[in-house]
Design a protein with these regions (language model features):
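ABC ATPase NBD Q-loop/coupling interface
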Residues: 57-79
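H-loop/switch region of ABC-family ATPase nucleotide-binding domains
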Residues: 200-201
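Helix-to-loop junction immediately C-terminal to a conserved catalytic motif
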Residues: 48
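Conserved catalytic motifs of ABC-family nucleotide-binding domains
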Residues: 160
Length: 256
């Protein structure tokens, strides 16, 4: 679990996160949503230590007890990152490495495994995301964008993380492939009881897998709830966000 408590972040005097408090739960897909400029990317980057917050606390339940990210030294942040998997907006695979070598990379950097153990773990993770064995020795350029995203997920879970951060994981994918990636993220979250945090503005994805949703507007948390509550939320800003989405337009069109 991650507890964000009264977090403030400013850039050049401009408040981007204004006293944000929210809980992000284990075994659930926690989504940070909002329009561009709402602060969702800054919040996610603050939660993984890429931005130093001005005020507040970001509390992680780690294998060594609860730790406050705010004020951690660089070495301590690196130690925390061993429990964190990251899925970037682009797949961010290394072009010079094979599919299997890409998944082995974090193991080489952060684990004490033998080469044989790393190979076995990488292959297990690739199989878990339904990558065919014939693809393991291919280069990223030789597989599709959807497969590249699967490899990125396999790499993100290689170290058996407690936390998985996903930045717009469906960016650039067609609807069918996006659904597959959503289901993979949801299944892995449930199976390994991971605290998954997804930064998204895609209503299809939000309504497919959003267990715990935090809606930001202009750096303020306007609403928090589940995907089953989102269409009934008594919040004008959230309603505007939902009604402007392509998903709502399709539903409205289908219903005449």
């Amino acid at each position: 679990m991650i507890q964000v408590r009264d977090v403030v972040k400013s850039f050049d005097g401009n408040v981007v996160l204004n006293h944000i408090s929210a809980d992000f739960e284990d075994g659930k897909v926690n989504m940070i949503i909002g329009q561009s400029g709402s602060g969702k990317t800054v919040l996610m980057k603050s939660m993984i230590g890429l931005h130093q917050i001005d005020e507040g606390q970001i509390l992680f339940d780690t294998r060594n007890g609860q730790q406050n990210l705010a004020g951690m030294k660089e070495k301590e942040v690196r130690m925390l990152h061993r429990e964190v998997g990251m899925l970037f907006q682009g797949s961010a695979l290394f072009d010079s490495m094979t599919v299997q070598e890409n998944v082995m990379y974090p193991l080489e950097m952060f684990s004490d495994m033998t080469n044989e153990e790393m190979v076995a773990r990488a292959r297990f993770c690739l199989e878990r995301v339904n990558m065919p064995e014939r693809s393991f020795n291919l280069m990223p350029s030789e597989i599709s964008g959807g497969m590249q995203k699967r490899v990125a997920i396999a790499r993100a879970i290689a170290l058996n993380p407690k936390y998985l951060f996903c930045d717009e994981p469906n960016s650039g994918l067609d609807p069918k492939t996006s659904l597959v990636i959503d289901q993979l993220i949801q299944d892995i979250t449930r199976e390994y009881n991971i605290c998954t945090i997804v930064n998204s503005h895609d209503m299809n994805s939000i309504m497919e897998i959003g267990d715990n949703i935090v809606f930001l507007r202009n750096g303020i948390k306007e609403w928090q709830g589940s995907r089953f509550e989102i269409f009934h939320a008594d919040n004008e800003a959230l309603n505007d966000f939902v009604f402007a989405s392509e998903l709502f337009k399709k539903v409205k069109s289908a219903n005449g």
